[in-house]
C-alpha cells in the first residue's frame, strides 16, 4: 500500500515538473515593462498609451535591415526639432571640414571716414567682454574687431559713417510660418548674416538678468555695439545698412569656431534654432544655392537624395523644425539613422553630438522611473512644437543589437486627440521597450 502511494506521489511530482517546463506561463508577459524575454518581445502596450495621441513609429535592426516596428511609418507628420538631424546631414555633406564664418571690417578708399562691418553669417559673434560668459564656446568678439580696426586707422581720422552689410544671406529674415511670439519667447532670432549672441537681449549667462528673449533688429544692434567699442572717434557716426563698396579694403576680421566641430554639436545637443537656420543657409551657399529659406529647403532634400534616401514626399519649410508646416515620416528618419549607425558618408559623427538618454543635452532629464533602464543607451534628437513631440536616433539595446528608430506623438484635430508634455515620458517608455527587446522586438 505504501509502495503504491509512493509511486503515485512520484508520478504526480513528475507531471508538475513537466507542466512547469512546457507551460507558456513559465515565461514572463512579453509586453511586461520589466521583462527581457529573448523569444518574443513587444512595445505594443507602451505604444497604446493614450498620452501619445496619434502615434507614429518605425524601427529598423541596423545590422540585419529588418523592420521591427511600423506604425504609420510612411504617413507624413510635422517634424519639430527632429528635422535638425537632416540639417546636420546637409551641412556635413556640403560644408568644408575646416569652414569658419568670418566677420570683416573694411575701409573705403575714397571715403576715409567711412567703415564697413560685413557679416559672414556668424550668430556666435559676441558683444560680451572679459569676465562675461556667452552660451557659445570661445566666440569671436566685436571688441576685438574694433581694437584691430583702430590700429589700422590714422589716429586723427574721425569716423563719421559705418555701413552695416548683412547681404551674405538672402531673402526674408523671419520665416512666415513662425509665430511672432517665438522671438520674444527666445526660441529663435531674425536670421541676419550680421548679428551677435544670437541676438539675445542679455547674453551674459553669469548674471540674473540673462535672457533668451531676442531683439527686433540684430543688424542695428551690432552697429551700435561696434560704434561704442570704437570710442570717441565714432560717437556721432551714422549707421547705414548697405552693401560693401567694390573697392573696400579689409582692415580687420574675426572668425567663428569651426562649424563642424562646434556649431553642429551645439545645435544638436541643445536644439538651438538660430544655429540650425544659420547652418542651413551656409550649407545652401556651399552647395551653390541661394543662402535663404528656399535654398536651405532645397539643399536638405537634395542631400538626402544623394545619400540614397527618398525625400520626395517630404515638405521642408525651415532648418530648425519650428514651422508646423514641415512634413516628414518616421521611415525615412529611421533609414537615415541606419546610415549614421553604419558610419556611411561620415555621418557617424552625429552620434557624438546628439543627446544621450539621461545624460546630455535635451535628453539629460528624460528617461525617468522604469524608463531609466535605457539611460545611457539611447542617442537621439528630440523634437517639440505645440501639438507634437518626437524622438529619432539609435538604441544600443540590452542584447547588444542596434536599433534605428523614429517616433512621434501628435495631436489629431479630426478626432480631437491632443498631446501634452506627458507625451515625453510616454515616448521614453516606448523607446525603453525598444532597448529591452532589442533584436527580439516584434509588433
Give residue spans per PLM region.
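Mid-domain, small-residue-enriched loop/turn segments at the edges of structured enzyme/sensor domains
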Residues: 29, 54-56, 111-192, 199, ...
Amino acid at each position: 500500500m505504501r509502495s503504491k502511494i509512493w509511486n503515485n506521489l512520484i508520478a504526480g511530482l513528475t507531471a508538475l515538473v513537466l507542466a512547469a517546463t512546457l507551460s507558456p506561463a513559465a515565461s514572463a508577459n512579453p509586453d511586461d515593462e520589466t521583462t527581457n524575454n529573448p523569444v518574443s518581445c513587444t512595445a505594443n502596450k507602451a505604444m497604446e498609451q493614450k498620452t501619445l495621441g496619434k502615434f507614429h513609429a518605425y524601427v529598423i535592426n541596423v545590422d540585419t535591415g529588418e523592420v521591427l516596428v511600423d506604425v504609420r511609418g510612411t504617413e507624413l507628420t510635422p517634424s519639430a526639432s527632429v528635422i535638425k538631424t537632416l540639417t546636420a546631414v546637409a551641412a556635413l555633406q556640403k560644408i568644408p571640414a575646416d569652414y569658419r564664418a568670418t566677420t570683416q571690417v573694411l575701409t573705403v578708399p575714397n571715403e576715409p571716414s567711412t567703415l564697413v562691418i560685413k557679416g559672414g553669417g556668424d550668430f556666435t559673434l559676441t558683444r560680451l567682454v572679459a569676465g562675461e560668459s556667452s552660451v557659445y564656446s570661445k566666440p569671436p568678439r566685436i571688441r576685438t574687431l574694433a581694437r584691430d580696426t583702430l590700429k589700422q586707422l590714422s589716429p586723427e581720422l574721425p569716423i563719421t559713417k559705418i555701413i552695416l552689410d548683412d547681404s551674405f544671406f538672402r531673402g526674408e529674415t523671419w520665416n512666415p510660418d513662425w509665430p511672432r511670439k517665438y522671438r520674444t519667447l527666445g526660441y529663435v532670432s531674425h536670421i541676419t548674416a550680421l548679428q551677435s549672441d544670437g541676438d539675445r537681449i542679455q547674453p551674459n549667462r553669469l548674471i540674473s538678468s540673462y535672457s533668451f528673449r531676442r531683439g527686433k533688429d540684430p543688424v542695428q544692434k551690432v552697429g551700435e555695439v561696434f560704434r561704442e567699442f570704437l570710442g570717441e572717434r565714432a560717437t556721432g557716426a551714422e549707421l547705414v545698412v548697405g552693401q560693401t563698396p567694390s573697392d573696400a579694403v579689409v582692415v580687420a576680421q574675426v572668425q567663428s569656431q569651426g562649424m563642424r566641430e562646434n556649431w553642429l554639436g551645439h545645435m544638436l545637443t541643445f536644439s538651438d534654432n538660430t544655429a540650425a537656420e544659420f547652418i542651413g543657409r551656409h550649407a545652401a551657399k556651399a552647395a551653390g544655392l541661394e543662402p535663404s529659406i528656399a535654398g536651405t529647403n532645397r539643399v536638405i532634400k537634395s542631400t538626402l537624395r544623394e545619400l540614397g534616401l527618398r525625400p520626395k514626399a517630404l515638405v521642408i519649410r525651415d532648418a530648425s523644425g519650428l514651422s508646423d508646416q514641415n512634413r516628414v515620416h518616421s521611415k525615412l528618419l529611421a533609414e537615415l539613422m541606419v546610415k549614421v549607425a553604419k558610419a556611411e558618408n561620415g555621418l557617424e559623427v552625429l552620434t557624438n553630438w546628439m543627446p544621450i538618454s539621461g545624460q546630455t543635452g535635451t535628453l539629460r532629464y528624460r528617461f525617468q522611473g522604469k524608463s531609466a533602464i535605457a539611460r545611457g543607451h539611447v542617442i537621439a534628437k528630440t523634437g517639440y512644437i505645440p501639438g507634437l513631440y518626437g524622438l529619432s536616433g539609435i538604441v544600443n539595446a540590452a542584447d547588444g543589437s542596434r536599433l534605428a528608430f523614429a517616433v512621434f506623438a501628435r495631436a489629431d484635430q479630426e478626432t480631437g486627440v491632443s498631446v501634452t508634455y506627458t507625451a515625453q515620458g510616454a515616448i521614453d517608455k516606448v523607446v525603453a521597450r525598444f532597448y529591452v527587446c532589442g533584436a527580439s522586438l516584434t509588433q
